[in-house]
Every structure is written in structure tokens, then in C-alpha cells.
From Swiss-Prot:
Coiled coil: none annotated. Expressed by the venom gland. It comes from the Eukaryota. Disulfide bonds join C47-C62, C54-C71, C61-C89, C73-C87. Belongs to the neurotoxin 19 (CSTX) family. 03 subfamily. The keyword Disulfide bond applies. GO terms for molecular function: toxin activity. Keywords: Disulfide bond, Knottin, Secreted, Signal, Toxin. InterPro entries: Spider_toxin_CSTX_knottin, Spider_toxin_CSTX_Knottin_CS. This is U1-lycotoxin-Ls1jj. GO terms for cellular component: extracellular region.
Length: 110
């Protein structure tokens, strides 16, 4: 009888210890996930929206529905006759086609 009681106490102690470790792991995972979400939100705030100028920061465009916008540049002739480069964040044609196909597929299949 003493052996069963001792074994039961040992089993309860091990179970409570393992469940406490598991809860600590879950708490740590929640904190890590929250920090990564905060970092992603800060990165989103710093990005350049669609159709805005990205001449000075060509890799800072925001994400679209499926793809990240790309900085697209064109050469513009000013009124004084100088050629300058102007860039804006936009969706490349192949990404537009892919988004169209995906959107069409969602409408058909559900």
C-alpha cells in the first residue's frame, strides 16, 4: 500500500511539473508570436503604398494581395528638357495576370 501511495505521489508530482513546463513553453511561444507580429506591423507602417513614389527607396514597397509591389521606373522629360527618372510602387504585368487567374479560380471553385 505504501508503494502505491508513493508511486501515486511521484506520478502526480511529475505530471504537475510537466504541465507547468508546457504552460511556460506556451507562454513563451505567445510572447514570441506577439513580438514578431509587432515587428511585422512596424515594417508595414514603413513601407511605400501602391502608386506612391519610390525613387529613393526602391526596395521599400508594401505587399499587395498576393505579391509585394515592385518599384517601376520610367524616364520623364521635364519642361526644361532634362531627363529624370521617376519611380512608383506598382504591380508588374505578370503579377497582375497571376492575381487575375487566382481571383477567377476562387470565383469558380469557391
Amino acid at each position: 500500500m505504501k508503494f502505491v501511495l508513493l508511486f501515486g505521489v511521484l506520478l502526480v508530482t511529475l505530471f504537475s511539473y510537466s504541465s507547468a513546463e508546457m504552460l511556460d513553453d506556451f507562454d513563451q511561444a505567445d510572447e514570441d508570436e506577439l513580438l514578431s507580429l509587432i515587428e511585422k506591423e512596424e515594417a508595414r507602417k514603413d513601407c511605400i503604398p501602391k502608386h506612391h513614389e519610390c525613387t529613393n527607396n526602391k526596395h521599400g514597397c508594401c505587399r499587395g494581395h498576393l505579391f509585394k509591389y515592385k518599384c517601376q521606373c520610367t524616364t520623364v522629360v521635364t519642361q526644361s528638357g532634362e531627363e529624370t527618372e521617376r519611380c512608383f510602387c506598382g504591380t508588374p504585368p505578370r503579377h497582375k495576370a497571376a492575381e487575375l487567374v487566382v481571383g477567377f479560380g476562387k470565383k469558380i471553385f469557391g
